[in-house]
Each structure stands twice: as structure tokens, then as C-alpha cells.
From Swiss-Prot:
One of its GO terms (biological process) is DNA-templated transcription. Keywords: DNA-directed RNA polymerase, Nucleotidyltransferase, Transcription, Transferase. It comes from Burkholderia cenocepacia (strain ATCC BAA-245 / DSM 16553 / LMG 16656 / NCTC 13227 / J2315 / CF5610) (Burkholderia cepacia (strain J2315)). This is DNA-directed RNA polymerase subunit beta. CDD domains: RNA_pol_B_RPB2. Its EC number is 2.7.7.6. It catalyses: RNA(n) + a ribonucleoside 5'-triphosphate = RNA(n+1) + diphosphate. One of its GO terms (cellular component) is DNA-directed RNA polymerase complex. HAMAP family: RNApol_bact_RpoB. Gene3D superfamilies: 2.40.50.100, 2.40.50.150, 3.90.1100.10, DNA-directed RNA polymerase, beta subunit, external 1 domain, DNA-directed RNA polymerase, subunit 2, domain 6, RNA polymerase alpha subunit dimerisation domain, RNA polymerase Rpb2, domain 2. Belongs to the RNA polymerase beta chain family. The RNAP catalytic core consists of 2 alpha, 1 beta, 1 beta' and 1 omega subunit. When a sigma factor is associated with the core the holoenzyme is formed, which can initiate transcription. The gene is rpoB.
Length: 1368
């Protein structure tokens, strides 16, 4: 088994019972794949598939002018490389994007040419089409300097859907069926029955019209319409009555209205008897072809065809007319014998289309189309062209209507066709097929669709959403181009004169900047980043809205299995509308979610893995991942629990066709990080998965002792750690950079065999948490590709580490852990276990105002020297300065408007100069309630403005760092080259050289070492071939030096050019403060099982409950928090964590007494290989075993995978191994070793009962009391009501609401009440009066009129009631 560099250092013991069949796929794959399909940047222009940008271009181009003599064709497009890299874009507030240029061809045809079109001239040119934001390697976008994520959207798939209203519309509870054809873009077409069973259609939810209008509009006559929907009864008219052609199945179940006889007149069915199967058999036996029926049997039936008099050509009766006695008379007169009527019955053949035809007043195709035109464009005159154009544009035009590949596939599948491809517009037979199925449904045949089935909902990813926006922009451009193409020839225009890229740029900018699906990335910790990118939302443009979404859409559906997580979704109004992808889920080419299954053949599980979509899955019998199998992969049990079409049942193994790949298949990343998830109630698991995303990265991350084994995947895929691109040897490491000399076999010939990784140091995340990377390799370490070189925020040795492992005791403690409060030991705070660093960005801009430019300077009058002490000569604070609320960070003055001066002031000005008074101090100060250390300053200066010293110094430092990187690369390149050179030169014969090297001498190592390396090139060799390769090496080194000089020059140019700043801004300074937040009462904390609480007290270490050996607990939780919430997983985690730490202490004790390596090996084998997944400890050298043991002293990390975790028995074994009987007895443990005797820290007395004690991974959440604490003395007031504003952001007051007023009223505190309602709220004169009184030392309140009373008076007046105050 292969262990990576970091895995070797600390193996996580897994309790999984099942081997890993299928690796967890790369977690950000959906985002990255979708966007690369959209761009197709690395694909040669000729080989691009018709998707993404290519599809958008080809769908809009060629653009033809109105007269048809000029057209603009699209050839190909290209993306330039971005001007700034990701980091520079973040610092400068720019968008990380690339310029899109399209090569287009303008073709002008000769108007004079009499016969077929002749090309007059062709112009080809590259045209700038706007900027396209690029995705970073971690799946986010940098827009205006901030990282954003485009969330995937789950929307209704295009296609056709049949449903009914569940009996809610009509009071009788009758089911009203409806169908809807949804295109990808274009008009929606709905069909619906009304309570009278007449079928209507509507376009885009407009007025409804009888469906036969649409059928006539597509060219069907009433006869053809009836022929499409009904079967006919054939009658032959006799002198008396008629003969009915006998069709057995149409008679069954009917009541005979007359005696039915056979040929010989024998009665087979008596009158008023129901016809049953025996009667029909008798009729068939009698070889009945016709049945004689009386005249009245025909009355009320409906004719199927027009009946025409053969002689005169007169229409006697039309199709869909009822047969009446007069009609029969006319028929007999005209001598017509054979007539056809519609066969209908009340059970399964209703007369719906026939009755609809009756309601329909249109006569022919033209009239029908005019009716549709009136409905779509009321008020417009229906000219022939307009009517035709509108009807064709609705469903038949490729520009306006697109069913899309998905829509066509879904449509054909639903109407039962075999082929899944076809035209992208609607066809006549599509409309007919839909109506037929709808009528069948009304007749009681077939099933309606389930809209919440994942086969009917598809995911639109970044690429597709961006493509739609881009196409929208292109369509806007197309309109403008069409206008100008007419003038192209006469004015000799080039393609770039025709195309204006503004509409495209603005469409793209609007989408990435302000669309509902483009969200500010949640960057609190690595897990929140991953989860945000894997999120699937039903909201957004073209999706649902919170208010309209009902219960069904939000609910968990059987098809979510393995595709969408049933647990992770937000609490509150968005519940169920925002979901997370399951661990193994993947999108197919149509955008439907698929999940992998193992193929089972003849009850034997094979290695073949198939991805099935929700529709395909419904056809198979699928076993769960925990089904028992033997070594050969055969299913052992007689009955296996399995699913088919969403139902769970027990079946025999031979019926199983597929099996789940892993037990964790059904949950998302966040939920699969919860150990013992299977023992938690789902509601609490939901809170647990949501709260892990809010965990603040601690100063020293600590791996969870009880994990699930997915932590490493999570940390590595999130991109917060640094991974090696290529294997090699670590050449140099410091806190900020790692240099790796690449292995020869991985280096590409001719390129620098050096990888330099610059680490991110103390950078602010979107949520103001700190992102900092720390190297975990040493010089000389051998690393291979993909190994973790540096830990990021919240990762520890390449594993996700969101919190800290705390020793937790479940017991009450003097009411301090009442109602989920948390009691914490002072030691936790003293050890900085939960200390986190938050970085605040403060910026100030110097603008050019009407009265002159603002200036950033140290020279500010009327500020004490103390306040300016931390500023340098440019007026900007030093890095490293510790500042508090109100301190000046950047000095800035703004010119003030000239005021009318008194003569005295004029005199003073004339004497002392005028600088002092005409500017006001607008410096950047630290906001209230904030303090910290300045860790970075950035200065941006507009092009053409003199840089100050500070800005210049920042640029020089940056260049120095870059030069260092280049020198390292050069050093390694030259080192390699000279090593190769030495190997080549030693033993060669020389013709001469430096230091008087005689001709014919053999070169040896000593001679080379004596020379300076560069003089080696002066050696003249006898061997021509060797001389040539000497020259080649010299040239390659010089070439590299030249390249490095160019790169440095490029960097210098980039840094020294002016910065792009918003209009009117001359200079911008950003100051970054690092704020240290220690744990304090009021902070919110939580475990991973939804067990959240607020710190109530931090207790001195001596007062905490302690064990017999004197070790105190870290955290005391209330045991009452467990039973009612049913999250028992936390108790199991505590037991297993106790064992993990116990094993660590035993390993530590062995290392301390310097036990033999063999003893360590035996103990480790006992831990790792006696249960759960086996580890290959044999392959470890003694040194590696020793390093592993050293890393395990703080606890052996366990992995208990979701739904496949540690059993009670395994936990028992681990506890026995960790606490031998002598230690257990000393600590006063119970027989199962999971409870301990504790002593009260304040009295020293032993508690009566043993206490559950152990280690739990506990998190500090991003709800810190520091961010919420707020106090106000005087502050801003609302304009109308004159009451103080609310909230911390507005520096507002506390609301004294209705109920609080009642409390004072009930108490009778009239004086306090008056003060609250007047001077402390909105009595304007009163509040100034109070201030005056206080200054005078007179403590009385003169309460006046509250402003809100005036507002009330004004409101009453607005109703037209004159109300006035009698002020006497």
C-alpha cells in the first residue's frame, strides 16, 4: 500500500469494514469541468465542439443584412492571457479575466449580378468582444478583487410534463389534467382541461382558447382532428333501424337497450341486461358480423365525417354534427347507406375533443391563426403577413424557440419514441402526440409525472449559465449589426466598425457581478469553500422563489439518493431549496445528476462501475453498500435489502442488478465529516453540517482524534494546502517559500527543473478570517507528486482540522451549563487553544474635489504629536504598530470651502499664513470597538501622479522578493548544469585552458574544483563532440539568464506603471489590521453533532472537576442536552476520543522510557491491524516507526466512516488497550472504561456518580461576542421620527418596544416611562434641555412633545381630517 509523505507521519486508524472500491472524485470537478467546456481555451479553433462560447457564436452568426447582400460570418475566437495574475487582481481590486477576440469575416455580394449571388469582396478581421472572467484553479472567480462563486442551479428540465391539480381547483374535487411543453428558450405551451371536460391551450400563460384552434392552425380539418382522436362505429342504414358492425370489446360492460339477436333471430342478450364476457363469446360463436339496432340507437351519436350527396355535391351533415331524426331523413332521401359515428363511452373513451370542437367558432386554418394572433397581440391589426410571421415565430423558428438537446431527448422519451435526437423546434406531430397522451390520461390510462423527480430537474452549471448570458449579449449586438450591415458596402466599413462589444461586456459583467447565483464566496474555512462550490440552488433567474415554493419541492425525494444530500440544507426560509451535491454525484452530458453503482451479475459483485441517472436507476434492483459479500464478491444473505423505483424491499440475491459503491454515497462532504452520523437525529445532523462551515480557523489547528477518513480529501481538494506539482527534493524552506529541485524523470527537457511555491502569509479572507500557510517539509525531504508541502488555514498535516480536541465531562456544574451553556477551563484560554486571528481591511481614498485635491500627509494641524507618532513621513502608519479605536492610520486633509471671514480673521491670516484653516482633517481612523496590529499597507497611485516614499518602498520590497525567487531558480539551474558539466569534463583530454593547462592533459576533479565555474567554459577540448556540448551548455545557461532578466523587467514594468483607480481617485491606501480574538463568555461553540451552545463562564483551572491523577476537564457540558435531541453520536465520539488519547499516552510513556522499537511495532500492530482496515506497517523502517510514534503521542487518530463506523465491540477493545486494568482502577473507571470518578475542584470531594468523560472535537463558530457587543451614548437619529437608529452598523440604540413599555406601566414606574418615551427617544427640544440641565448641575427632565406625535398628526391630516393642537 502506498502512503504519501504526510500520511506516513500520522496514519489514521480506520474502522471501515468495506474496502474502498471507488475513490471519492475530485470535489470541485463539476465547477472546473463546466467552465473549461464553456471556454474550450486549450482546444485548437478547428476542433472545438459546438458548446459554450463556440455554440453561442454559431447560434447568432452568420448575421445577414435586411437586403441580403451583406453578411457577417464567424470564423473562430481566441482568448488572450490575463494581464494580472490572481493575487495581483485581489490586491488591486481588479477582475481576473481574459480578453476575447473573435475572427469574423464580412462577405459582400454583388447587387448587379443577374443570376446566382456573386461574392464581390471579403474582409476578415479579429474583433475585440469584451472580457471574460476566468476561473481560478480552485473553482472561484475574482471579480473586482473579491472572490465569488457561481452556484449551480437546479431547474425544471425542458421537455413535456403531464400533471393534475390534485382536485384543488374545483369544489367537486375533480382531477383537472394538464400538460406543458417547456422549451429551453421560447414560449411555453400549456394544455388543460376545465371542469366541463373541454380541452384548452394557452401560450405563455395568456388567455386560454379551445385546443382545436391550435390543431386547425397547424392545418388539420375537423375530420382529421376527429380521426386522430377517436375510433369509429360503422352503421349501415336500413329501411327500419340500422346494422351496426360488431366489434366485441366495444360492447363489453354496456347495458343492452334492446334485445340483441344472432342471425337466426335467437335472443342472446335480453333488453336492459349488462353485456358480459359470456354474451360476447356467444356472439362470436354465432359468427356475428352485424347487429341490428333500432332507429333511436343512432340518435344523439356524433358523425365522424362530412356526409355529401353524391349527385349534387351538397353537404348534408358536417363532421361532429349530432344525428337527429331530421338528419336521418335527409340521409335516407339522398340514398346514403353507410355512415360513421364516433365511438365514445363514459368509462375510457370520453368525447372531449368532440365537445371542444363544438365550442370552437373558427372555421379554417386562417381563422384559427388570426384568433391566435388576437390572443397574443391584442389591438394589432391581423394582416396576413403578421399572422403568419407570429405563428411561425412562436414554435417553428430556430431563433425564437429552442427545445435544446435535453428537451428533445426528454420529449421523445415521454411520448414513447425510440430516437432521442430530432429537430430543436416543435413539430406538428409533437403537438398532436402531447394532446393524445393528455386525452389518454383523462381517459384513465397512464400516469402523471412527478415534477420533483430528479429525472425531471436538471442542473445548470457555471459554464451553461455564462453561455446563456453571453448569448443574450450577442443577440443585442446582432440587432445593431443588422442595422449597419446595409451601409457596409457604401461606406467601406471593416468588421470592427460594425461590432460594438459593450452589450456583451455589460451582460457578462452583470451576470458575474450581481446575478442572484453569483455569490460572495464563503471563505470562513476550507470546508465552507468546498461546500459553497458544490451547492445546488433551486432559486435564481428561471427558478423558484422562496414564497412560491411549496412543501413538495423542498422535501427529500427517493431520487436524491446518492445525488443530493438529504441532510445538508439551510434552516429557515431556504430549507430544501438550497442543497448540496452528494459525495460521489456527477453531472452527465444532459445536466442530470448521476451516481455510481457496482454492477452485479448472477449475484456476484463485479469491479465494473456504472453511473446511473435518476431515470435509469428506476429500472434496476439496487442493493445497499453494506450487503454482506464473501471473498469472491458473492452476496451471502438469503434476502438482501434493496431498492427498486424508490421502494425499499428484501429480495433474493439473484434479482440484484447493482450495488452502492460506498456507504457514504448518500451524504454530502460536510455530513460525511460527522463521525457516528448514523447515531444522530437528522435534524441535529443538519445543524452539525451547517455549523462546521462556520468554524473559525484556530491559531494552531489540531486534527480531530475521531474523524471519518474524508478529512484529507477535503483539505487537499479545497486548495488551501500547497501540493507538489512534481516530485523532487526540497532544496530550501523558510516560512514564506519552498523551493523544490524536480526529479530528472519528471522535468521536461530544456525547462528549469525548479518549482518554487510562494506561500500565502496572513491574508484576509472574505469573512475576515486569516489565511496563512505553514510549511511541513524540511530541507532534504523527498516528496512525490501530489504530496502536501504546506498546511493552510484549518489544516493539520494535510488533514482538515476545524476545531480542537477538548476533554469533555458530561455533568451539571452549579447551573452554569443550564440550557446549553458551556463551561470552559481557564487553561484552554491560557494555552491559546481557541485563539483566532481576524484581519480587517480599512481603506481611504484621496479624491480630486471641486475645491482642489485631497492630500495624504503627516502634516495635519490641530492633531497632537502623540496621535501622529505612528505615522511615517508620508502620513501612513508603520507596519507592526499596535493601534486602538480612534487612532489615526492614514493622515488625510480635504480642502474646505471658502467661508466669509471676519476682519480679525483676515488679519491673522495675513500674518500667519493661510494653510491652517482651509483644510479639514478627514484621516482614516480605527473604527470603534476595534484594536489590533498593522500587518500590511498597500498604496495605489494613479498614472501620472508622483509616488510618495512609502509607495516606492513597497514596490522595492516586492521586486526584492521576486529577484530572490529568480536567483534561487538560477542557482539550481546552474548547479545542475555544472554538475552535468563536471561529469562530462572529468577524464577528457584538453587542448589547453586556464591556469596554463598543457595540451594533451587529462582533466581531473581537483583541477575543476580549483577553477571558478565560469572558467570551465574556457577549457579547449580535443574531442570536437565534447567541445560542442560544452558550448551548448554555456549557451543554455546564458539563455536562461536572459529569460530571467526579461521576466524581472516585465515584473518591474507591471509594478511601476500607474494603478487603475475609479474615476476621480488620485490615491488609495489599504491598511490591514490583525485582530487577535481570544475565547470569552458569549462566544458560540459547537460540536459536530448539532450540539451548540454559548460559553457562560471561564472557570479557574483549580475549580474544574478533576480525575484521580489530578488532570482537570477542559469543558463541562450538560448531560440533559443529549437525550431529548437524540444526537447520541456525540457520546460515542467522546468514548472513542477517550480511547484515542489513552493510546497516545501509552505510546508517549513507551517513548519516554525508551522502549525497544520492536515493542512499539507490536503495540502499533495491535492498534492498527486487529480490527477495521489493515495498515501495512511491515513496509515502515525503524526511523519511520519512531516518527509515526512521536506524532501519535497526542492521540491515535481514528476514522469511523459514515454508516460504516466503529462498533461497540471495537470501541471496547480500543478502551481496553488504552487503559490497562491498573490504570483503570487508579482512575476509578467503570467496567466498560468509559466513565470515570471525578472530584470537585472547589471542595476536593468525590462526586457521587461516575461521569462520562472523553475527548470531543469542539469548534468555535464565527459568531463572536466581540462582533456583536455594542453600546451607544448619543448617535444618529432617524430623519422623520427623530428616534435613534437601530443596529450596530448604524451605531444605533436598543429598542424599547411595546412589551417593555407594558412592563414599566405594570410596575408603575411613571418617571422612567416618561423619560423612555420622550427625552431618550424622540423629544428633540427635551434632549437638548437635558444636556443644558446636566451642565448646570440641575438633574431634572423637562419633557416636551415627542416628534412621533407630530408624525401621527400629519398622518391624520393626510386622510383629510383637520386636526390641530390647542396649545392653551
Amino acid at each position: 500500500m502506498q502512503y504519501s509523505f504526510t500520511e506516513k507521519k500520522r496514519i489514521r486508524k480506520s474502522f471501515a469494514k468495506r474496502p474502498i472500491v471507488h475513490q471519492v472524485p475530485f470535489l470541485l470537478a463539476t465547477q472546473l469541468e463546466s467552465f473549461s467546456t464553456f471556454l474550450q481555451a486549450d482546444v485548437p479553433a478547428t476542433q472545438r465542439k459546438p458548446e459554450g462560447l463556440q455554440a453561442a457564436f454559431t447560434s447568432v452568426f452568420p448575421i445577414v443584412s435586411h437586403n441580403g447582400f451583406a453578411r457577417l460570418e464567424f470564423v473562430s475566437y481566441a482568448l488572450s492571457s490575463p494581464a494580472f495574475n490572481i493575487k495581483e487582481c485581489q490586491q488591486r481590486g481588479l477582475t481576473y479575466c481574459s480578453a476575447l477576440r473573435a475572427k469574423v469575416r464580412l462577405v459582400i455580394l454583388d447587387k448587379e449580378s443577374p443570376n446566382k449571388p456573386v461574392v464581390k469582396e471579403v474582409k476578415e478581421q479579429e474583433v475585440y468582444m469584451g472580457e471574460i472572467p476566468l476561473m481560478t484553479p480552485t473553482g472561484s472567480f475574482v471579480i473586482n478583487g473579491t472572490e465569488r462563486v457561481i452556484v449551480s442551479q437546479l431547474h425544471r428540465s425542458p421537455g413535456v410534463f403531464f400533471e393534475h391539480d390534485k382536485g384543488k381547483t374545483h369544489s367537486s374535487g375533480k382531477l383537472l389534467f394538464s400538460a406543458r411543453i417547456i422549451p429551453y428558450r421560447g414560449s411555453w405551451l400549456d394544455f388543460e382541461f376545465d371542469p366541463k371536460d373541454i380541452l384548452y391551450f394557452r401560450v405563455d400563460r395568456r388567455r386560454k382558447m379551445p385546443v382545436t384552434i391550435l390543431l386547425k392552425a397547424i392545418g388539420l380539418t375537423p375530420e382529421q382532428i376527429l380521426a386522430n382522436f377517436f375510433v369509429f362505429d360503422n352503421f349501415t342504414l336500413m329501411d327500419e333501424g340500422a346494422q351496426l358492425e360488431f366489434v366485441p370489446e366495444r360492447l363489453r360492460g354496456e347495458v343492452a337497450r334492446f334485445d340483441i339477436t344472432d342471425r337466426d333471430g335467437k335472443v342472446i342478450v335480453q333488453k336492459d341486461k349488462r353485456i358480459n364476457a359470456k354474451h360476447i363469446r356467444d356472439l362470436e360463436a354465432a359468427k356475428t358480423k352485424f347487429i341490428s339496432v333500432p332507429e333511436d340507437y343512432l340518435l344523439g351519436r356524433v358523425l365522424a365525417k362530412n356526409v355529401v350527396d353524391g349527385d349534387t355535391g351538397e353537404v348534408i351533415a358536417s363532421a361532429n354534427d349530432e344525428v337527429t331524426e331530421s338528419v336521418l331523413e335527409k340521409l335516407r332521401e339522398a340514398g346514403i347507406k353507410d355512415i360513421q359515428t364516433l365511438y365514445t363511452n363514459d368509462l375510457d373513451q370520453g368525447p372531449y375533443i368532440s365537445s371542444t370542437l363544438r365550442v370552437d367558432e373558427t372555421t379554417d386554418k386562417t381563422a384559427a391563426r388570426i384568433a391566435i394572433h388576437r390572443m397574443m397581440r391584442p389591438g394589432e391589426p391581423p394582416t396576413e403577413e403578421a399572422v403568419e410571421a407570429l405563428f411561425n415565430r412562436l414554435f417553428y423558428s430556430e431563433e425564437a424557440y429552442d427545445l435544446s438537446k435535453v428537451g428533445r431527448m426528454k420529449f421523445n422519451r415521454r411520448v414513447g419514441r425510440d430516437e432521442i435526437v430530432g429537430p430543436m423546434t416543435l413539430q406538428d406531430d409533437d403537438i398532436l402526440a402531447t394532446i393524445k397522451i393528455l386525452v389518454e390520461l383523462r381517459n384513465g390510462k397512464g400516469e402523471v409525472d412527478d415534477i420533483d423527480h430528479l429525472g425531471n430537474r436538471r442542473v445548470r452549471c457555471v459554464g451553461e449559465l455564462a453561455e446563456n448570458q453571453f448569448r443574450a449579449g450577442l443577440v443585442r449586438v446582432e440587432r445593431a449589426v443588422k442595422e449597419r450591415l446595409g451601409q457596409a458596402e457604401s461606406e467601406n466599413l471593416m468588421p470592427h466598425d460594425l461590432i460594438n462589444s459593450k452589450p456583451i461586456s455589460s451582460a457578462i459583467r452583470e451576470f458575474f457581478g450581481s446575478s442572484q447565483l453569483s455569490q460572495f464566496m464563503d471563505q470562513t474555512n476550507p470546508l465552507s469553500e468546498i461546500t459553497h462550490k458544490r451547492r445546488v440552488s433551486a432559486l435564481g433567474p428561471g427558478g423558484l422563489t422562496r414564497e412560491r415554493a411549496g412543501f413538495e419541492v423542498r422535501d427529500v425525494h427517493p431520487t436524491h439518493y446518492g445525488r443530493v444530500c438529504p441532510i445538508e440544507t439551510p434552516e429557515g426560509p431556504n430549507i430544501g431549496l438550497i442543497n448540496s451535491l452528494a459525495l460521489y454525484a456527477h453531472l452527465n452530458e444532459y445536466g442530470f445528476l448521476e451516481t455510481p453503482y457496482r454492477k452485479v451479475v448472477d449475484s456476484k459483485v463485479t469491479d465494473q462501475i456504472d453511473y446511473l441517472s435518476a431515470i435509469e436507476e428506476g429500472r434496476y434492483m439496487i442493493a445497499q453498500a453494506n450487503a454482506a459479500i464473501d471473498e469472491d464478491g458473492r452476496l451471502i444473505d438469503e434476502l438482501v435489502s434493496s431498492r427498486e423505483a424508490g421502494e425499499t424491499m428484501m429480495v433474493t440475491p439473484d434479482r440484484i442488478q447493482y450495488m452502492d459503491v460506498a456507504p457514504s454515497q448518500i451524504v454530502s462532504v460536510a455530513a460525511s465529516l460527522i463521525p457516528f452520523l448514523e447515531h444522530d437525529d437528522a435534524n441535529r445532523a443538519l445543524m452539525g453540517s451547517n455549523m462546521q462551515r462556520q468554524a473559525v480557523p484556530c491559531l494552531r489547528p489540531e486534527k480531530p482524534v475521531v474523524g471519518t477518513g474524508i478529512e484529507r480529501t477535503c483539505a487537499v481538494d479545497s486548495g488551501t494546502t500547497v501540493q507538489a506539482f512534481r516530485g523532487g527534493v526540497v532544496d530550501y524552506v523558510d516560512a514564506g517559500r519552498i523551493v523544490i529541485r524536480v526529479n530528472d524523470d519528471e522535468a521536461v527537457a530544456g525547462e528549469v527543473g525548479v518549482d518554487i511555491y510562494n506561500l500565502i502569509k496572513y491574508t484576509r479572507s472574505n469573512q475576515n478570517t486569516n489565511i496563512n500557510q505553514r510549511p511541513i517539509v524540511k530541507m532534504g525531504d523527498k516528496v512525490s507528486r501530489g504530496d502536501v508541502l504546506a498546511d493552510g488555514a484549518s489544516t493539520d498535516l494535510g488533514e482538515l482540522a476545524l476545531g480542537q480536541n477538548m476533554l469533555i465531562a458530561f455533568m451539571p456544574w452549579n447551573g452554569y451549563n443550564f440550557e446549553d451553556s458551556i463551561l470552559i477551563s481557564e487553561k484552554v484560554v491560557a494555552d491559546d487553544r481557541y485563539t483566532s486571528i481576524h484581519i480587517e481591511e480599512l481603506n481611504v481614498v484621496a479624491r480630486d474635489t471641486k475645491l482642489g485635491p485631497e492630500e495624504i500627509t503627516r502634516d495635519i494641524s490641530n492633531l497632537a504629536e502623540v496621535q501622529l507618532g505612528r505615522l511615517d513621513e508620508s502620513g501612513i502608519v508603520y507596519i507592526g504598530a499596535e493601534v486602538e479605536a480612534g487612532d489615526v492610520l492614514v493622515g488625510k486633509v480635504t480642502p474646505k470651502g471658502e467661508t466669509q471671514l471676519t476682519p480679525e480673521e483676515k488679519l491673522l491670516r495675513a500674518i500667519f499664513g493661510e494653510k491652517a484653516s482651509d483644510v479639514k482633517d478627514t484621516s482614516l481612523r480605527v473604527p470603534s470597538g476595534m484594536s489590533g496590529t498593522v500587518i500590511d499597507v498597500q498604496v495605489f497611485t494613479r498614472e501620472g501622479i508622483q509616488r510618495d516614499k512609502r509607495a516606492q518602498q513597497i514596490i522595492d520590497d516586492e521586486l526584492k522578493r521576486y529577484r530572490l525567487d529568480l536567483n534561487d531558480q538560477l542557482r539550481i539551474v546552474e548547479g545542475d548544469a555544472f554538475q552535468r558539466l563536471a561529469r562530462m569534463l572529468v577524464g577528457k583530454v584538453a587542448n589547453g585552458g586556464p591556469k596554463k593547462l598543457a595540451k594533451g592533459t587529462k582533466i581531473d576533479q581537483a583541477y575543476l574544483e580549483d577553477l571558478d565555474h565560469y572558467h570551465w567554459f574556457d577549457i579547449r577540448l580535443a574531442d570536437d563532440e565534447a567541445a560542442a556540448s560544452l558550448e551548448a551548455i554555456k549557451n543554455s545557461i546564458e539563455e536562461k539568464r536572459h529569460q530571467f532578466d526579461l521576466a524581472f523587467e516585465e515584473k518591474r514594468k507591471k509594478l511601476t506603471q500607474g494603478d487603475e483607480l475609479p474615476p476621480g481617485v488620485l490615491k488609495m491606501v489599504k491598511v490591514y489590521l490583525a485582530v487577535k480574538r481570544r475565547l470569552q463568555p458569549g462566544d458560540k461553540m459547537a460540536g459536530r453533532h448539532g450540539n451548540k451552545g454559548v460559553v457562560s463562564k471561564i472557570v479557574p483551572i483549580e475549580d474544574m472537576p478533576y480525575m484521580a491523577d489530578g488532570r482537570p476537564a477542559d469543558v463541562v457540558l450538560n448531560p440533559l442536552g443529549v437525550p431529548s435531541r437524540m444526537n447520541v453520536g456525540q457520546v460515542l465520539e467522546v468514548h472513542l476520543g477517550w480511547a484515542a488519547k489513552g493510546l497516545g499516552w501509552r505510546i508517549g510513556e513507551m517513548l519516554q522510557r525508551q522502549a525497544k522499537i520492536e515493542e512499539l511495532r507490536t503495540f502499533l500492530t495491535k492498534i492498527y491491524n486487529e480490527s477495521g482496515r489493515q495498515e501495512d506497517l511491515e513496509s515502515f523502517t525503524d526511523d519511520e516507526i519512531l516518527e509515526l510514534a512521536k506524532n501519535l503521542r497526542e492521540g491515535v487518530p481514528f476514522a469511523t466512516p459514515v454508516f460504516d463506523g466503529a462498533t461497540e465491540e471495537e470501541m471496547g477493545k480500543m478502551l481496553d488497550l488504552a487503559f490497562p486494568d491498573d490504570i483503570a482502577e487508579q482512575l476509578g473507571m467503570n467496567p466498560s472504561k468509559n466513565q470515570v470518578r471525578l472530584y470537585d475542584g472547589r471542595t476536593g470531594e468525590m462526586f457521587e456518580r461516575r461521569v462520562t468523560l472523553g475527548y470531543m472535537h469542539y469548534l468555535k463558530l464565527h459568531h463572536l461576542v466581540d462582533d456583536k457587543m455594542h453600546a451607544r451614548s448619543t448617535g444618529p437619529y432617524s430623519l422623520v421620527t427623530q428616534q435613534p437608529l437601530g443596529g450596530k452598523a448604524q451605531f444605533g440604540g436598543q429598542r424599547f418596544g411595546e412589551m417593555e413599555v407594558w412592563a414599566l406601566e405594570a410596575y408603575g414606574a411613571s418617571y422612567v416611562l416618561q423619560e423612555m418615551l420622550t427625552v431618550k427617544s424622540d423629544d428633540v427640544t427635551g434632549r437638548t434641555k437635558v444636556y443644558e440641565n446636566l451642565v448646570k448641575g440641575d438633574h431634572v427632565i423637562d419633557a416636551g412633545m415627542p416628534e412621533s406625535f407630530n408624525v401621527l398628526v400629519k398622518e391624520i391630516r393626510s386622510l383629510g381630517i383637520d386636526i390641530d393642537l390647542d396649545r392653551n
